[in-house]
C-alpha cells in the first residue's frame, strides 16, 4: 500500500488516498491492515472517462472525512505485476463488479455487501453511512 500513485503522473489520486495492491488483501478478500476502520475503496482505471470525472468527488470526500480510510485500486497499474490477480479477487468478493469505476465499502476489513447509487460526494456520504 502506498500514498504514491503508480505512474506518478497527472490524473492520479493523491494523499490522503492510498493505493492498494494485491498483497494488501487476505486470500478471502478481507483487508489486512484496517481492523476497526471504515474503508472506502474506489476501483478505477486511468483510461476510464467516468473514473476521471468521479476522481474529484472521491478526492474531496477523502479530504473531508479523515475518519474514513479512502483507498483506491488502479485497475490498469503499469507498474504492478499482480493487478490481474487483484481485479480477479475483486470480481470474486463482489460478483456485481463489471467495470470501472466501482466502489467497495469495508468495515473492520470485511466487505459490506452494498451498491452505490452514483459518484458524487453526496452519493459517497450515503454509501458509507
Swiss-Prot record:
Site feature (Contributes to redox potential value) residues: 49-50
Keywords for the protein's UniProt record, in alphabetical order: Disulfide bond, Electron transport, Redox-active center, Transport
One Pfam family here: Thioredoxin
Domain of life: Viruses
Annotated S-S bridges: 48-51
The keyword Hydrolase is annotated on this UniProt entry: no
Active site, renumbered: 48 (nucleophile), 51 (nucleophile)
Family stated for the protein in its record: Belongs to the thioredoxin family.
Function: Participates in various redox reactions through the reversible oxidation of its active center dithiol to a disulfide and catalyzes dithiol-disulfide exchange reactions.
Name the UniProt record assigns to this protein: Putative thioredoxin-like protein 041R
Organism name: Invertebrate iridescent virus 3
Amino acid at each position: 500500500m502506498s500514498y504514491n500513485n503508480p505512474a506518478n503522473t497527472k490524473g492520479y489520486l493523491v494523499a490522503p488516498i492510498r493505493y492498494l495492491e494485491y498483497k494488501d488483501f487476505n486470500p478471502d478478500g478481507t483487508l489486512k491492515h484496517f481492523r476497526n476502520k471504515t474503508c472506502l475503496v474506489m476501483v478505477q482505471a486511468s483510461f476510464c472517462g467516468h473514473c476521471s470525472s468521479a476522481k474529484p468527488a472521491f478526492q474531496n470526500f477523502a479530504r473531508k472525512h479523515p475518519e474514513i480510510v479512502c483507498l483506491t485500486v488502479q485497475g490498469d497499474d503499469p507498474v504492478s505485476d499482480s493487478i490481474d490477480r487483484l481485479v480477479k479477487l475483486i470480481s470474486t468478493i463482489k460478483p456485481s463488479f463489471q467495470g470501472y469505476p466501482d466502489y467497495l465499502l469495508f468495515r473492520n476489513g470485511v466487505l459490506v455487501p452494498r451498491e452505490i447509487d452514483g459518484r458524487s460526494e453526496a452519493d459517497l456520504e450515503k454509501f458509507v453511512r
